Amino acid sequence: LYVCINCNYHFRMSAENRIKMFFEDGDYNEIIPDKISDDPLKFTDKKKYKDRLKEYRKKTNRDDAFILIKGKIKDKEIISGLMNFEFMGGSMGRAVGGAIVKGAKIAIENKLPYVIVTSSGGARMQEGIVSLMQMPRTIAAVDLLNENNIPYIVVLTEPTTGGVTASFAMLGLSLIHISEPTRPNN
């Protein structure tokens, strides 16, 4: 499970490998998040944000940093969202926020537990305030889960920082938090 047997070092696990581990019987279907327009701010640093998105989409074969799934673990159906650190450090922008909200809505509609696995550097700087707006959006979605008595479980993996930590991952709204050990600095 990505742990060194000699020194107990915990290696980072990809979102794809987590999916295989969670749904070991392969009993799952990905839910396609709603499409949104790229680059609402026309952001450019060393390269255009649109170009950076294209680069990461090609590299990861994913549209963004969140994978939404409906599947079964030991015959129990769940909705699961996994942050993909390989896509721009798992940063949360509009697409990630929208996918988290969509997952919450599906969990409520189907009365299924919602399990999120975090792995994120925080809010996506290329989206500025639009990215920061995802914090209250995701908090409201988790609050709706609680109002509807839907189990909400957060698995905190290394790293989980910034706006993700300050919003849906750690605000005490979840019923269960599970945390992996952090990796020591080398």
What would you call each of these model-derived segments?
Residues 157-167:
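Gly/Ser-rich catalytic serine loop of serine hydrolases
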Residues 1-153, 159, 171:
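Terminal-region recognition feature
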Residues 176-186:
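Single conserved hydrophobic/aromatic residue that forms the stacking wall/gate
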